[in-house]
Amino acid sequence: GFGMLFKFL
């Protein structure tokens, strides 16, 4: 989910 994207940020 978007959780992974937020981790990269």
Curated annotation (Swiss-Prot):
GO function term, MF aspect, one: toxin activity
* Principal location: secreted
Please list the tissues where expression of this protein has been recorded: Expressed by the venom gland.
| Protein keywords | Secreted, Toxin
Q: Where in the cell is it found?
A: Secreted
UniProt similarity note = Belongs to the cationic peptide 04 (cupiennin) family. 08 subfamily.
What is the protein's name according to its record?
Short cationic peptide-4e
Q: Which organism is it from?
A: Cupiennius salei (American wandering spider)
Lineage, please?
Answer: Eukaryota, Metazoa, Ecdysozoa, Arthropoda, Chelicerata
